[in-house]
């Protein structure tokens, strides 16, 4: 039986993910104690071809060794995939503020603040993250986009085409959680120090003109795209659904935006399925 285990940080979207899997034909069980998982999987395998089960922090064992033993037992009998949903700390805090719900660890310990509960959960979930086949950063995904990402990972599409995401980000806001490759461009010339360019972004022509005149910038783009092109065929043969390439500068406004755009457009011109996104630009718009 195909068994999908959905887990992740509280507030990252496990319930949404489980509903999405139910919509594409998985038999779904929400929030099962992990000690019951092998027995339930054996029962379901008699009548179901595929099932999805969500696990949250309250139902995981205290021992990482015990977790390893349970997952090994399942892998010996079933086709297991573990999907871990994640989001950055500020996104989780905002979601809890919007929903006005308590974090599961705050329910167990009312003296625990939301921030402390989020941090404690991250530590406790670390052993499970090590087993994940897919980690999805839900901070920038709509409900529909999360459902589509899950569908493509599990069901694929007719041509099995690798989807490439090239994204810019600012290191001051933290590393992207879903990146396969991270390139740091903070050593390149910075338009921020030019007062006329500071309010602009790497998508605007004056900034493009500023960066494109530097040989170091051109060399970085050239060597980075060559590196990706060298290994892309092997990544495509590895039956991956997504490849996420993250380009980071200090604020995610100038250098990383320009270079991510250049790389993304290059691979689009090569006929690859590429999505370009600029994760930190929205933060600058809201200032």
Swiss-Prot record:
Alphabetical list of Gene3D superfamilies matching this protein: P-loop containing nucleotide triphosphate hydrolases
Protein name: Nucleotide-binding protein Asuc_0930
PANTHER family assigned: RNASE ADAPTER PROTEIN RAPZ
Binding site for ATP: 8-15
Binding site for GTP: 56-59
Record key words, sorted: ATP-binding, GTP-binding, Nucleotide-binding
InterPro entries per record: P-loop_NTPase, RapZ-like, RapZ-like_N, RapZ_C
Function (record text): Displays ATPase and GTPase activities.
